Amino acid sequence: MRKFCLGVILASFAVLLAAGISSAQQRFRIGYAVPLTGTFGRDGNLVKDAYTFWADLVNAKGGVEVKGKKYPVDLSFIDDKSMAAENAKLTEKLITEDKVDLVLGGFGSDSVFAGSAVAEKYKYPMISGSASSNKLFERGFKYYFSTLGKATEEVRGCVDIAQILSPKPKTGVIVGSDILFTSLAAEGYKKHAAQNGIEILLFELFPITLQDYNSMLIKVKQKNPDILFVGSHLMVAMKTIKAMKEIDFTPKMVAFSYGPTVPDFVKSLGKDAEYVVAASEWAPNLPYRDPFFGTAKQFNENYFKKYGRYPDYVEAASAAGAYAMQVAIEKLGITPPVKEPDRVKLMEELHRQDLATFYGVVKFGPDGANETHPPVAVQIQNGKLVNVFPKGAAEASPWYPMKPWKER
């Protein structure tokens, strides 16, 4: 009798264990490494919020719908501490030890460059909404995708805006930090400045660890440019504005490749953020929509309801990337646990994808870059980001020229 009871107990335990395993397998386990601390900690937390926003909405709707059945999403993330080598190591851990079904990209071209190489090695599709260095797309990779355009094109709106400014700017200075994205953004400024007839008086890259911004900008001030173009992340953009005020330097316009669209920029600088122009690839007034997030405006408002702040374009791009992966999974009928043949099919489907989203059309080229996403320029006016270029998408005219610091 004891043996019979023990057998029943063990059998019941085995059934429960199997049910638990089965239940775990009925969820998409998705992981990513992202900077939550260090130089890019604030930026990385935006990406984390974007993925969480997407996953929470998926789960609120019951899960990813495949062949009439819904599968919830489990997100796991690890802090790469703003170090590219750490991102590669953690991405490998997610794949080989944690055995996640899928991966997403972290933040920044350097870290994503490293992490995507690991994803390529293990044939894991990786979509990023926060890395756009041209070099990411020059490796012949099949498994890396970006909802952003290339860095050199991302800043085009910040230069092309000169076409509608009066008096038309004739000269510029380009500075930027010497890391992957920002140095290529600086090269993009140079390319588009030449096309717009803007003479570049100085081109200089500086260490990302630079502390003395005043001395660098005094050199820039001496050139007396109409426009200062900066290859930047959030930290660089904030330090540049603070130093410009300290040395009383006011060109007619200042433009940044990234930073001012992050809510912390205006929050930290207050009125000193006024007049600043920044590159962007999305704005909530644009006429984009999809059946999952709704319109660009609805995405913007719902994001505010969840986080108490509006998203920047990197958050929109990151959420759109996760959605693009979701749509491909649903179309292919992939169910968890995801196996290598499924991931190969997923990669192939992403290369075919031509998807209308709240963020705009997502259509990946052979190199993984988003081919159809036009860059825009935004400006901080009365504490808010306003789309000012191109004209067809603008909410307001650009404030130009900048008011001198002493007149504000």
What does each model-identified segment do?
Residues 2-16, 20-408:
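Extracytosolic ligand-binding ectodomains
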